[in-house]
Structure formats: C-alpha cells, structure tokens
C-alpha cells in the first residue's frame, strides 16, 4: 500500500511539475510573441513619426534659431517663456474648458462621464474661488521661483538654450526617464505626506476635495507643492541636462496629465483618472502616478477589488464605463 501511495504521489507530483513547465512555456511563448509584436509595432510607429519629425525638423530648427537670434544675450527670458508661460497657458486653457463644465453642468452629455455621480453638480463656487486663489499663489510664489532657480543649474550642466534641437528618439528616451523619476519621487513623497505628522498640517488641504476637479491638481499647501508637485517633475530635466524644447513639452504634458487625473470625468480617448480619483475617495490607496510602485508595495489591493479598477482603462468608445461596467447592486438588508 505504501508503495502504491508513494507511486501515486510521485505521479501526481510529476503531473504538477508538467503543468507548471507547460504553463511556463505557454507564458514564455505568449510574452515572447507579445514582446516581438510590440517591438515591431513600436518600430513601425517610431519610423513614421521619425520621418515626420525629420521632414519638419528643418522647419522647427529654423524657427528655434530665429528665436535664439531674437533673444540673443537674453536667453533666460526665452527659458522663462518656454518653461513657465507656455505650460501655464496649456494648464489654464484646459482647465478653463473643464471649469465651464464644472460650474454650468453644460454640455449636459459630459455629466454621463462623471466618476463620482452626484458630486460637484455644480461645484461649490466659494470653495472653487478659494482653490483657484491657492493655485495661483502656488504658481506665482512657488513654481515660478523654482523654475527660475533651475535655469542657472541647467546652464552650468548643459545649456538648455543650445542651438541644436534634440532628435525624436532622444526626446522619447528623455520622456521615459522623466516619467520613471516622477513616479519614484512622487510616490514616496506622497506617502510621506500621508504620515500623521505631515498629513494634518500639510497634505490635508489637498484632500479637502474628496471628489476632485481639474484645477485642484495644484491646490495644495506650499510645502507640498514644492516637494511633491514640483520636484518630481523638475529633477528629470535637471539630471538629463535637457533642451528647453524637451522641458517645455514635459512640463506641459505633466500639467495636462495631472489635470486629467483630477478632473473627475472618465472621458473618451483620454488617460483614465480612475486611479487617482479613488485615492481622493479612500485616501490610503493609489499613491503613485503609473501605479507601478503601488503594485510593488501593495497599496492598490483595495482598488483592485473595485469596479473602479475594472474601469481603469482607456475609453475608446462613447459609452461611459459607468454604464458598460455598472456598480454592483447594493444588498437589501
């Protein structure tokens, strides 16, 4: 009997090992095929974009050289325009459109895409005015001086207003590095701000909005704005010694992305704001930007059990995800 039992256990163990190796081979095949497909697709996309970039590169290079001639000897003014004024123009233009929706509720169809239904319909005008004043203060008294002080460091490291524009592939590499640096610095600074010592005096201000809107992406205590909003975005260009053109695009993109993350609407063809919206709702989940460090540290486990996680995808149609993936019906007591 013992021999038969041992033989059966051995066979069962062999079958399990076979299943494991089979699963590993299938996984390797799927991942390998997926990786090859992604590389082929990426090479195709970048080839076409590179052709466009190259074809228009002469035009942009000529315009850049014209700007250098215009601001010769006053490159710091050009840096100020590119690193501060242009990103701010993008920020307020985008938020201006969102504020029309937030304050009037029009166009009506936008409300179908609201993440937290019934919240900010319409937004409290007193609370909104206070938030806008804080955002303007942070931009004028924190963001502007930090970017101004950034210029001499960049000038010493590698002139941001150098004559030659970066290549397309170099900018893609920079963008990837900027994003990774931002993820690390924002995640850990954000978690630190949730420590009771700092939360009550500093970070609580930002969490006054449990259902966020776009403009409050920069609504924060000045210390938080400097440490958690500005530094994670600034460090990347400083490390890379980036060209002003890269800095302008990166700062503008960062402001647009953080606005989308806070806007409160899961709109078609825009990045999903479900992740950060859930953070404002629950406070102790989803601290990062990409979600990579949240996954590694287990600070997204509750989020992954929700409908918000199922909806955390790029919406490629016009049917709101709250309708295609509705909330589970509440249990009757």
Swiss-Prot record:
Down-regulated in primary acute myeloid leukemia (AML) patients. Residues 176-299 form the Fatty acid hydroxylase domain. It is a multi-pass membrane protein. One of its GO terms (biological process) is sterol biosynthetic process. The keyword Transmembrane applies. Induction: Up-regulated during 12-O-tetradecanoyl phorbol-acetate (TPA)-induced megakaryocytic differentiation of K562 cells. It is found in: Cytoplasm; Membrane. Keywords: Cytoplasm, Membrane, Transmembrane, Transmembrane helix. The chain crosses the membrane at residues 29-49, 77-97, 134-154, 168-188, 215-235, 237-257. GO terms for cellular component: cytoplasm; endoplasmic reticulum membrane. Its main location: cytoplasm. The keyword Heme does not apply. One of its GO terms (molecular function) is iron ion binding. It holds the Pfam family FA_hydroxylase. Belongs to the sterol desaturase family. Promotes megakaryocyte differentiation by enhancing ERK phosphorylation and up-regulating RUNX1 expression. This is Fatty acid hydroxylase domain-containing protein 2. It comes from Homo sapiens (Human). The gene is FAXDC2.
């Amino acid at each position: 009997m013992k021999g038969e039992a041992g033989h059966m256990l051995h066979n069962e163990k062999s079958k399990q090992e076979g299943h494991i190796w089979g699963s590993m081979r299938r996984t390797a095949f799927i991942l390998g095929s997926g990786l090859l497909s992604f590389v082929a697709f990426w090479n195709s996309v970048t080839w076409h974009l590179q052709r466009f970039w190259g074809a228009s590169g002469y035009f942009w290079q000529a315009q850049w050289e014209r700007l250098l001639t215009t601001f010769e000897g006053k490159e710091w003014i050009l840096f100020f325009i590119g690193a501060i004024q242009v990103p701010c123009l993008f920020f307020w233009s985008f938020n201006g459109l969102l504020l029309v929706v937030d304050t009037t509720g029009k166009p009506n169809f936008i409300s179908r895409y609201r993440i937290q239904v019934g919240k900010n319909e319409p937004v409290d005008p007193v609370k909104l005015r206070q938030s806008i004043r804080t955002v303007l203060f942070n931009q004028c008294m924190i963001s502007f001086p930090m970017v101004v002080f950034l210029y001499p460091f960049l000038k010493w490291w590698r002139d941001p207003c150098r004559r030659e524009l970066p290549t397309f592939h170099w900018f893609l590499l920079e963008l990837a590095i900027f994003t990774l640096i931002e993820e690390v610095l924002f995640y850990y600074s954000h978690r630190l701000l949730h420590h009771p010592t700092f939360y009550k005096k500093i970070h609580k201000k930002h969490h006054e909005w449990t259902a966020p809107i776009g403009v409050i992406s920069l609504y924060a205590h000045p210390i938080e704005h400097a440490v958690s909003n500005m530094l994670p975005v600034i460090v990347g260009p400083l490390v890379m010694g980036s060209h002003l053109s890269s800095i302008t695009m990166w700062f503008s993109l960062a402001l647009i992305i953080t606005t989308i993350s806070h806007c409160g609407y899961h709109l078609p063809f825009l990045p999903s704001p479900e992740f950060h919206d859930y953070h404002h709702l629950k406070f102790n989940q989803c601290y990062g930007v990409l979600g990579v460090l949240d996954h590694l540290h287990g600070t997204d486990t509750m989020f992954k059990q929700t409908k918000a996680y199922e909806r955390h995808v790029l919406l490629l149609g016009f049917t709101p995800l709250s309708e295609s993936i509705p909330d589970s019906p509440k249990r009757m007591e």
